[in-house]
């Protein structure tokens, strides 16, 4: 029987990513804002355009394109369904990692499989299935780093020093590589390093483990981001462009942090209890509504554990550790540190999805400790089941933007009436850079209005490049569909006036563009030098 259980478990772990790919085909094609803005464009900008165009994807033009390289080539040459299946397969690799994380805390395979399955089908994770968003694509690296860190915390940590140091370094390396692919994942990597400081070893050994993990994280970050940071620094003046530009002072971005602070909590109390607030008001942390009760449930259990620890300490007049094992301390401290960094810098829910995947494992650990050492297992089991059932019944998946399937992921038909080579000044508030790769390679695109303001240096460079083109157009998504964009035509000084042009609306051309079956009419209007 045990042999059959082993084989069935192994089959489930191996087959799950393949099955997850088929599940993605029933969710429809991804057509989210980020895809239309930069996921498809950025690899083209680096590999084909050689960074000649200026900010077509707004500030996201400068993101590390390494994670999107496979998507770009696949979307250009494969069917949309094949692309989505491949994306979901990679996302499904988190399942076996979650299983092995759960196995650190339970000997029951069925419980570990259940925790992994619930985690990968949680609201945030499942909303991104088959989507090119990087939160779930980098999750296998972040979760893999956590798993290696947990292995380093096993009892042999008190003996085999070289093995443990190697595991700690590997944990940092894998997690750091994931953070380099998507910088918003760095709270997980920092927390992985810090968590080694709380295990029950002499301080010097804990420090050595944290140092080894930190060195591994730096190497991993350099492997995935180093090339791009160097490219940004040498060509554009900052390795983190456009962020932290008050430090790096690149002339190609405003001298500020250039971060999105709209979703940050106000004050310490809001930050500490943010899971409860975003559960009641999902738009605090996401542009769409969603519901996932596991995060506030986990915080509630953690608060009860703290209250219990304080009460026991006061009664016995001696400190009693909340968590008995190094693995428990490691994963709980990692969770808390990740959350605190995230809520202070980002507070965007989808950046926390790898932690959401872990919540069912964490709930099992924390609920067990809540009732320890009395061991009333029926009560603990009932509480855990109640949380899981409540989460499943109330779960609401975030609609990131889906469409029916088309043969090709993206279709753009460039009208023959546009004279090439031409320059296009991109305006408006909508994402449209995905259309740029379908234009002739000798055309020039420059964003003069968007979510980042062109600096004087950027304006000067655009003006210089425009001199080489006799035919110049304004480029935007149908302005009549967006009143704020349509108002540009009636402004006394519209954005293109800065570059010495007036618009001729009589010669406007609609460019048929489509993500899946969703059409997006991109318009060009000729500009005349004033």
Stretches with model-predicted labels:
Residues 1-3, 156, 188-221, 361:
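Perimembrane helix-loop-helix junctions
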Residues 93, 98-123, 140, 159-162, ...:
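Transmembrane-helix signature of polytopic, membrane-embedded enzymes
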Residues 94-102, 277-324:
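Hydrophobic, aromatic-rich transmembrane alpha-helices
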Residues 211-282:
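Membrane-lumen/periplasm interface segments of specific transmembrane helices
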Residues 73, 82-107, 144-148, 305-311:
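Transmembrane-helix motifs of polytopic, lipid-linked glycan transferases
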Residues 124-138:
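Short acidic/glycine- and proline-prone juxtamembrane loop motifs at membrane-interface regions
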Residues 27-42, 51-71, 78-81, 235-243, ...:
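Extracytoplasmic catalytic/substrate-binding loops of multi-pass membrane glycan-assembly enzymes
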Residues 39, 384-453:
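Membrane-embedded, lumen/periplasm-facing catalytic core of multi-pass transferases
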